[in-house]
Amino acid sequence: MNPAFGAAQIRELTDVFVEKSIELRDAWDAELRTQQGEAEGKIDVLSWLSRMTLDVIGQAGFNYQFNALANGEEENELNRAFSTIFSSNMEFSIITFLRLGFPSLRWVPEMKDDGSKQARATMDRVGRELLEGSKKNLQTSGKVEKSALKGRDILTLLLRANMATDVPEHQRMSDEEVLAQIPTFLAAGHETTSTGTTWALYALSENPQVQKKLRDELSTISTDNPTMDELNSLPYLDAVVREVLRLYPPVPFSERLTVKEDVIPLSVPVTDRNGKVHEYLEVPKGQFVFMPILSVNRDKNIWGEDSLKFRPERWESPPEGASAIPGVWGNMLTFIGGPRACIGYRFSLVEMKALLFTLVRAFEFELGVPAEEIGVSSWIVQRPFLRSNPEAGNQLPLKVKPFTSCILKLLYEYH
């Protein structure tokens, strides 16, 4: 699957990230206008970002139009099925814990009722339709059509790589194996990015000086439609994204299951409850190994006494201890590391940068409720909720004000 997530492929998809970010910007502008014409209004940014990133993974991943940003009456069946299956109000069960250790179960919720079963059946059917359509196109034409992201959607790229003539038959993925990737792409490719961007807007709301500094840098780009290279050329935007993903990793922990006995060396000796000093850990086959992503990302021994503070400037000179963290990106464990690191980290990073580029240039953000009202619920992905109204589910209301109104106000006062 690696060819579908390389830098060249993500460069092709950047237009989708930017176009959907602009669509979200315009939707927020329209939403603010409906709030009695006030200069600023409240928006649940988590809900909107979740819909935007679902649209992106549908279009960039499968050439499928979720239309999640559109009005409810335009919602399609796959959007409804996805919302049903991945509801944040799912109950815990034994399968919940088994998913932590078995990747094949991780993104497949337990079917508790007829509605969930019907939703899963819809996802399977539409997934097969997408799969068969892409396969037929490749088999009959021998090449990808220039429509639909110029043939660069992830499913088409995955099938193209899988059907390459130089791939031995025993290394090819079966249709069932390819189909099984679709729920994983949908969940991992949309929940994590929307949550990460939500925490970014939260951090910027709490730190207006950082928000202003970022907006000043973003304003140096003269177009509303930046390329991937232009997004990656902005050092403070990169620092903000790094700091958000360090302090607020969407997935706070993970687990691995050992398939054979192994030895884990320790960088610092550990003394157990019996007083025995260990310089390494012997791990038996079948042992779950807990990976404390959030704890490592906030460890004062690595990041200093201000490790809990949101300070993008720390990335101008990262601490020496961070260089030893074996993450696939950014000297942190947010995207894990090694051969089972997050395969879509480039996808997520560029999408997040496109969102912040578009939204921070267009709006000013402030907390919509006192900071102490905002709690964190963690079930695979950590999301915000309001302590005063937990029954309402995950949300993050922010005060949102068009930035242009601030400029016009200053010009008016000057004259």
Q: What is the predicted role of each segment?
A:
Residues 18, 39, 77-80, 84, ...:
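Cytochrome P450 I-helix active-site segment
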Residues 30, 208-211, 321, 328, ...:
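Cytochrome P450 heme-binding "Cys pocket" and the immediately downstream C-terminal segment
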Residues 107, 237-253, 387-415:
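C-terminal domain-closing interface element
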Residues 118-196:
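Conserved cytochrome P450 catalytic core segment spanning the I/J/K helices
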Residues 192-205, 355:
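Short, small-residue alpha-helix embedded
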Residues 250-253, 273, 290-322:
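Conserved cytochrome P450 K-helix/beta-meander segment immediately N-terminal to the heme-binding cysteine loop
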